[in-house]
């Protein structure tokens, strides 16, 4: 389950978080072992206790000093107090739920039942996937933050802003950018 949860060929990895970092965080988080164990044999549901342990683990992946257990709260702290770019924040709680589902499908069902001759796998659609034409990850049930919260994007340019991340994404600079929106891209 650890391998699936932290990213593999069929489950996404966490932005800028490698296996080595995840392993170190796991070594200091005993309750996580029980959570991974609960999921490794194709559970029919993901318990609240297990989901909470995985959410706490995700918070620690992005901020090892955090006392919190909510990824949404960690996102707010990392963005407002530590100046992180949105692309380096942990996933939202809704996105993490879908990530957990995909990891359980891969690790618990596909790998967990690998020695079973005739597997009876559930539909991937029940475990964080969608199939408009072919199976692909369902990232979240929420609208994409970059689209619904454009005012939260920020660049680190101090002047003209022709090549900043805001301009590249075809967004205007805002007061949250280093240029304070006082540039040629506002």
What kind of region is each of these model predictions?
Residues 1-186:
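Non-catalytic nucleic-acid-binding/docking modules located in mid-to-C-terminal regions
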